[in-house]
Design a protein with these regions (language model features):
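Histidine-acidic metal/acid-base catalytic patches
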Residues: 1-32, 58, 91, 97, ...
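Aromatic-lined substrate-binding rim segments of carbohydrate-active enzymes
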Residues: 48-68
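Conserved beta-strand positions in the central sheet of alpha/beta enzyme cores
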Residues: 40, 66, 102-104, 155, ...
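Active-site acidic/histidine proton-transfer and metal-coordination neighborhood
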Residues: 59, 78-181
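Short, flexible active-site-adjacent loop segments at beta-strand->alpha-helix junctions, enriched
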Residues: 5-7, 63, 68-70, 107-111, ...
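Active-site mouth loops of central-metabolism enzymes
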Residues: 7-23, 42, 74-81, 125-133, ...
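Acidic-and-aromatic substrate-binding clefts and catalytic sites of carbohydrate-active enzymes
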Residues: 38-52, 72-82, 160-165, 187-193, ...
Length: 298
């Protein structure tokens, strides 16, 4: 079982932007103290650089299990820049002895998709056309080649407010590429899919799992207000396990019947608004770990 800095308020839209993001050392201490055995990287450099990351993780008995790598796959003019950034992230993996870490490839999205979270399941017009999918697949192939050349097996993270959000978009990625799939229970729910069905149907491709719960009504409010994905984060669309609308009991029952043997990463993205929020987030992750022990036997 692993956790991630985003559960404590440290991710791409907060680090270096908001004043109440907790220090990395306190996050690592909280992850270890809650009973998790690994962590994802968070924004590159947040947990440490190539000289310090391995020691920081070892001091808390944590393995590096993955790191989020956004790439603008639909925009080839940005591939050189984004793949160079990916290569630098893989340098961190190597420096941390992250031999089991998954490069978590994700679509860098577009301004349009960021404005319309949770809509692609019912409105395919905001998705890619056939030429766009061909470009997208070529970009994914290049990223996979880079990861494998560096000795890491990648995974692809479907994500709300990107070009791979809805089940039909995930299926296109699986059809057009050979990349493994990161199944995220929360983002799939927000994208109009069912995590249990996905685990059953896509199980042979799944090589990494994020465990999330979500409040459906928060996303519904965001859509009703014509708000964007950052606003969904600010409104707290992700919640503690067992308190939202994802049928996690069904998901874990299906998981127990599957052959999956990779990491499970608990994520509860939150945006810190005061110094107190870091302590509240740490308490939430303790409760999430206890929920998993009680309900999933993990």
């Amino acid at each position: 079982m692993a956790n991630a800095p985003c559960s404590y308020g440290a991710f791409e839209i907060t680090v270096g932007v908001l004043p109440d993001v907790p220090e990395a050392e306190s996050v690592l201490s909280a992850i270890s103290g809650a009973g998790y055995e690994g962590t994802e990287l968070g924004p590159p450099g947040y947990l440490g650089d190539r000289l310090t990351l391995r020691k920081s993780l070892a001091n808390h008995g944590l393995a590096l299990v993955g790191g989020y790598i956004p790439i603008r796959f639909s925009e080839p003019e940005h591939w050189t820049e984004d793949l160079a950034a990916m290569d630098a992230t893989l340098d961190l993996f190597a420096a941390a002895d992250g031999t089991q870490a998954k490069p978590v490839l994700a679509d860098g999205g577009s301004a349009e998709r960021i404005r319309f979270p949770g809509r692609a399941a019912v409105d395919r017009s905001i998705g890619l056309d056939e030429a766009g999918w061909a470009r997208f697949a070529e970009g994914v192939a290049q990223a996979c080649d880079l990861a494998r050349t560096r000795g890491f097996e990648p995974t692809f993270h479907h994500h709300t407010a990107t070009f791979v959000e809805a089940p039909w978009e995930i299926e296109r990625v699986l059809e057009l590429t050979d990349v493994g799939l990161l199944l995220d229970t929360g983002h799939l729910r927000l994208g109009g899919g069912d995590p249990t069905t996905a685990l059953r149907e896509w199980g042979s491709r799944i090589n990494h799992i994020h465990i999330k719960d979500v409040h459906d009504e928060v996303l519904a409010g965001v859509i009703a207000d014509a708000a964007d994905m950052p606003e969904a984060w600010h409104r707290g669309v992700f919640c503690e396990l067992g308190t939202g609308d994802v049928d996690l009991d069904s998901f874990f029952a299906e998981l127990s019947r599957s052959d999956y043997s990779g990491w499970l990463v608990v994520e509860q993205d939150m945006v810190p608004r005061s110094p107190r929020d870091a302590a509240d987030a740490a308490a939430s992750q303790v409760r999430n770990r206890a929920w998993l022990a009680e309900h999933a036997g993990l």
